[in-house]
Every structure is written in structure tokens, then in C-alpha cells.
UniProtKB/Swiss-Prot annotation:
This is Allophycocyanin alpha chain. PANTHER family: ALLOPHYCOCYANIN ALPHA CHAIN (PTHR34011:SF2), PHYCOBILISOME 32.1 KDA LINKER POLYPEPTIDE, PHYCOCYANIN-ASSOCIATED, ROD 2-RELATED (PTHR34011). Keywords: Antenna complex, Bile pigment, Chromophore, Electron transport, Membrane, Methylation, Photosynthesis, Phycobilisome, Thylakoid, Transport. It is a peripheral membrane protein. Heterodimer of an alpha and a beta chain. It comes from Synechococcus sp. (strain ATCC 27144 / PCC 6301 / SAUG 1402/1) (Anacystis nidulans). It comes from the Bacteria.
Length: 161
């Protein structure tokens, strides 16, 4: 839930107007909107490159994943792995745009560890893949933009670790 929604829900629950502090936080959120949209657009426009680079780095660091018997062995399974990386990259953009981790939690993190465990997928390899996504994506961003996006990647990595 965005800071705007949270503030309104809290104020309404207490049957009051938004406080000066809440209004200031909303103002800060709105002012940062252009930056958040720019970050998400940069990532979205470069997603194929980011995912490919992250996948290549992951497979170099974790050759067991693409070796016979590995979860990404073979063309179809490698494509599935890259699809999953793209999914996490997309979730990060949702977090960036909303300025909140809620979309990441609600859409893609709840139950993910159990799912990967049931599939026999090494969760640490998935987390490493997201680390590589972070590296590739933040290299395209500068300063505060990289820090902003990096925080959402870190949240996903933490949830997977």
C-alpha cells in the first residue's frame, strides 16, 4: 500500500483529516514520482539485456545449475530460469513505482521459498540470480536512482535468502 493509501486509511480509521506530517510525506512521495517512473522505465526498456546479463553471470558463478541434473539444464529449463529472473525484475519495478514493498510481497514473495523447495530448485541460486539482476540494472542507473532500485532488489534477495 502506498504512502498515500496508508495515510488516508489511517486518518479515516481515526475519523480525522490528514496531519501536517502525513501531508509532508505524501508531498515527498509525489515529488519523487518522476524519479521512480524514470527508474522503472529504464529497467523496463533494458529488461532483455539485464536478464541476459544476469543469467550469464549466474550460470558462470553456479555452473551446477546448467549442468546435467541442474534445474536450468537444457534449453527449455534455461529459458524457464530466465523467465523467473524477468519476473523478479518486473516485481522490482512495481515496488519502485509504488514506493513500497507491498506489491512485491503480495504478488511474488509469499510462498516462493516453499514453491522452489517443492520443485527442488536451489533457493540460493535464485537469490544469486536476483543479485545479478541488481548488479546489471543498477549499472544502468546513477546515484540515488541506483540506490532506490537497489533497495527493492535487496528486499527480494532477503526474502529469498
Amino acid at each position: 500500500m502506498s504512502i498515500v493509501s496508508k495515510s488516508i486509511v489511517n486518518a479515516d480509521a481515526e475519523a480525522r483529516y490528514l496531519s501536517p506530517g502525513e501531508l509532508e510525506r505524501i508531498k515527498t512521495f509525489v515529488v519523487g514520482g518522476d524519479r521512480r517512473l524514470r527508474i522503472a522505465q529504464t529497467i523496463a526498456e533494458s529488461r532483455e539485456r539485464i536478464v541476459k546479463q544476469a543469467g550469464n553471470q549466474l550460470f558462470q558463478k553456479r555452473p551446477d545449475v546448467v549442468s546435467p541434473g541442474g534445474n536450468a539444464y537444457g534449453e527449455d529449463m534455461t529459458a524457464t530460469c530466465l523467465r523467473d529472473l524477468d519476473y523478479y525484475l518486473r516485481l522490482v519495478t512495481y515496488g519502485v513505482v509504488s514506493g513500497d514493498i507491498t506489491p512485491i510481497e503480495e504478488i511474488g514473495i509469499v510462498g516462493v521459498r516453499e514453491m522452489y523447495k517443492s520443485l527442488g530448485t536451489p533457493i540460493e541460486a535464485v537469490a544469486e540470480g536476483v543479485r545479478e539482476l541488481k548488479s546489471a540494472a543498477t549499472a544502468l542507473l546513477t546515484g540515488e536512482d541506483a540506490d532506490e532500485a537497489g533497495a527493492y532488489f535487496d528486499y527480494v534477495i532477503g526474502a529469498l535468502s
